[in-house]
Amino acid sequence: MKKSLFCGVCLCALVAMGGTSFADIMVGVGAPLTGSQAAFGEQIKRGVEAAVAEANAKGGMNGEQITLVYGDDAADPKQGISVANKFVGDGVKFVIGHFNSGVSIPTSDIYAENGVLMIAPGTTNPTFTERELWNTFRTCRRDDKQGIVPGKYMADNYKDGKVAILHDKTPYGQGLADETKKKLNELGTKETLYEGVNVGEKDFSALIAKLKQAGVNVVYWGGLHPEAGLIIRQMADQGLKAQFISGDGIVSNELASIAGPAVEGTLNTFGPDPRNNPDNAELVKKFRDAGFEPEAYTFYAYAGVQSLVNAANAAGSNDPMEVATAMKEKGPFKTVLGDISFDAKGDPSLSPYVMFEWRKGEDGKYNYFQK
């Protein structure tokens, strides 16, 4: 039973890869399936597969079954563009993806020009929807809303402290750092240090020495978990006792694997955990019975499929432009994230960001819990 949970949708995906003649509605899954951010790609893949299996069992999109095809963008904009062009060439008309803002923004132009609707489960940079392309939607929140929470938290709790704001120079990481800095400054607190590092960097000893010399007692990180985990661990190794705060880019259990016990007390912002919603209890159990923990963006990807299918059925059409119109005009749509409506830009109606703290759970493992 555990192995066969999503076998139907996996079989459909294999059919699509081998030849598209059997496909009804082709939906592309664009995500980092390999590389340092593959954990997020796996969350998106699992969420999409589970939602498509459910949708197909209920009749699919206007009576047509959904077939999945996969594109590994490896969190790289250039590879993402190659994936987008491949999807277009294969006849894909709907995409769940991409994850990284730096990938979603350039690929959205390709999709828009070729009649492809995309729903991004993890793209939080405001620019993605601010351009108001007809085809861009997201099921996650925006960084201009996210930055308000840590900015206010640091202004309230470290008014006389020394704050360092670090980022990974990406549209997501630097964008989030800038939004956080903006709110912090608005509330009268000036950061002591603002600095970028490179994605993939491993040795942060020089940076941490700089933080120590500046007397920093709180570090805000705009970026993802691979670098965050190393910074947290190396801060502890070098004796820097500072509160580490970040955003939704570190919500992976891999953070604890990288940082070790030093992850204790780390704070991050994210939306309320949909695993704790009683309405999702059966679905959470299915994932866990299949050996997968549906953390972070799993449910955001699942909700993307639900929004797509519900909008198509409401429109009575599988034409991407007609579905896009329905997404903006015929909501709210019932999803695992709650009822979602989309505004004219493609942004969803979701509850605000909240703060989480990393600590040991009842199972003795480190995880993030809402404060």
UniProtKB/Swiss-Prot annotation:
Component of an amino-acid transport system. It comes from the Bacteria. Residues 1-23 form the signal peptide. It comes from Brucella abortus (strain 2308). This is Leu/Ile/Val-binding protein homolog 2. Pfam families: Peripla_BP_6 (PF13458). SUPFAM superfamilies: Periplasmic binding protein-like I. Belongs to the leucine-binding protein family. InterPro entries: Leu-bd, Leu_Ile_Val-bd, Peripla_BP_I. The keyword tRNA-binding does not apply. GO terms for biological process: amino acid transport. Keywords: Amino-acid transport, Signal, Transport.
